[in-house]
Amino acid sequence: MDKLVIRGGKQICGTIPASGSKNSALPIIAATLLTPDGTFAIDRTPDLKDVRTFIQLLNYLGAETSFENNLLKVSTGQLKSIEAPYELVKKMRASIYVLGPLLARFGHTRVSLPGGCAFGPRPVDLHIMVMEKLGATVTIEKGFINARVNGSRLRGTHIDFPISSVGATGNALMASVMAKGTTILDNAALEPEIECLCNFLVKMGAKIDGIGTTTLVIDGVDQLKAVEFENIFDRIEAGTLLCAAAITGGSVTVTSVAPEQLASVLDAFRQSGCTVTTNGNSVTLTAPAELNPVDITARPYPEFPTDMQAQWMALMTQARGDSTIIDRIYLERFNHIPELNRLGAHIEIRDNWALVHGPQELTGTKVMSTDLRASACLVLAGLVAKDTTEVLRVYHLDRGYEAIEKKLTALGADIRREKYQEFS
């Protein structure tokens, strides 16, 4: 197993480009299953564990793929299976994205219930509701979702999501683009990753109106085609790198971004006393002499993202005063708190919110990652902690950050990856 060894106390300074977004790449890769026509070329695909797992899943289904220098090529003309097996799906919850496109293309599919980060309930009920609304019969048997179209193809319908869901919106889009008639999605997710998926599907030949709003109108088409496409940037990675500068008293410019997609995070940084400027496709953050405490509540886009909640908590351990952190999306996403407290933080969990007492001097020790963003949180804490911090189980980190230790090293961090043996 790998661990990251961090000697804290180094300022994070310099210029670094943002990687492509994992959260948009995965549904885009799934959408290639919609058509046998041609070869897709998806640029700016991040080289991550989750992406590699998804490529493995496509290969299992019979797709031909090549992946080099962040360019992914996919051809799904000769698929040999419509079943997504447990052995691959268990590794990440995003595997559920194959449900919609396989059902739309073949009329039936069998997908194992997904895995991924272990925090709080993440039911597949909304995905099943979407497929049933579109005219499929869905059952769950022996850990598999079995879905079959009643008739020759899915049928357009009106779907009003009870809550905003990125995953269910993505699956609804992919399932409905070739459905007969018109589908209306109300309370659709607003996240940039959904807008990116819409743009990808439109380039393939789909007809989607209302892109960038909570109401999407999809007129089904008979066929789609393979295309070339460039993925968007990873706004969570960008926010994490900005946090690294803020927590260490440094200054960083992150390039190849769309600053407007970071608006809520940049506003929070400004409230904390950081100087934040944008210039075209770049964001520059310079840390203040003292950080102000800033309360945040994680909600669906365009509000503060749940995927930045843990990193913000690490930052607030260094603020001069107390701050509160609430997560309205995943109420139990606080697995990082005990590990932060091991480093010397003083954080209390009160019902479904956390109270961070700052500032606290952190001291390096061994800490264990429990999920993707908790891993990033602990790395940030290690950057400012005295002495040496060892972050164990960084396979979680590798699911969503592309060579993060190399990027941080380029910005001045003393961080290295080492092998270790974990006792059972």
From Swiss-Prot:
Gene3D superfamilies: Enolpyruvate transferase domain
Active site: 117
Keyword Cell wall biogenesis/degradation recorded: yes
Pathway the protein takes part in: Cell wall biogenesis; peptidoglycan biosynthesis
Cited CDD domains: UdpNAET
Residues engaged in binding UDP-N-acetyl-alpha-D-glucosamine: 93, 122-126, 307, 329
Pfam families in the cross-refs: EPSP_synthase
Protein name, entry field: UDP-N-acetylglucosamine 1-carboxyvinyltransferase
Organism: Chlorobaculum tepidum (strain ATCC 49652 / DSM 12025 / NBRC 103806 / TLS) (Chlorobium tepidum)
Gene assigned in the entry: murA
